[in-house]
Amino acid sequence: SFVDISKMKPLKIVVNAGNGCANICFENLKKYLPFHFTEQYMKPNATFPHGVPNPMLEECRRPLINQVLLDGADMGVAWDGDFDRCFFIDHKGNFVEGYYMVALLSRYFLNRYKGETIIHDPRVYWCVQKVCKELGGISVESKGGHAFMKETMRKVGGIYGAENSAHHFFRDFSYCDSGMIPWLIVAQIISETNESLYELVSDLEKEFPCSGEINLPASHVDRVMQAVEKEYAKDAKEIQHIDGLGMDFGEWRFNLRASNTEPLIRFNMETRGDKLLLEEKKKAIMEFIKNQN
């Protein structure tokens, strides 16, 4: 079992399915749970009257954030249309980047299962690697995408793997991803620690500030990425091509990946505790890519 319901407190949780499919599973779960729910857009509706069910988009999160603040809820949870991903709002109305949720869940598993292996994607990962090192776990990098993540998890026997896009994979769930297991684990962590979600991730956010995923238009994606690598290679301590282009400069690093469906470059960046450096380098790289177009 991933959680112990007997240890859970009667948290106030706002849930939003975006009129997707999550309610089918949620209805079967909630009768066993001690939480007080406020429900938004839970009825499946293929016309999506409240907009596309994509909580990665800021405008899709606004109703959930407003309700969390109105209710004084402990957290908000939103699912995408097929509910294989879930997204979190803390009690202050802040969206919690998937990166920090991966680190939080990694900490949960490593506290319970010593020496286990955690799989992460190449976008941003310093935070996850630190958690693994502190708790005696092993971190393994995998190319993003469910097929690659599952293959890597099976190969190394990873107990948990995740992409920063909010796909969470579990060995004891047949190595599949789930949008229901993560929020139940987070609810248990809050219940056990008496810490808010905000408190649980604030140290991670400060130590490893990240850009979040930024989509940048690029008419010739491969050419642009080659130009970026050439421009920054002389200062890089490490260059990776596990999934797109990853460049590490010691105190900051970034990853560029080509979209599979659109003429876009997906840009992620992180630093070691330096928000000013994050903004400076982010702006410079985005401007460089813009000029290549």
Where are the model-predicted features located?
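Phosphate-binding chemistry for phosphorylated carbohydrates and sugar-nucleotides
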Residues: 1-194, 206
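Phosphate-binding and adjacent anionic-ligand microenvironments
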Residues: 113-293
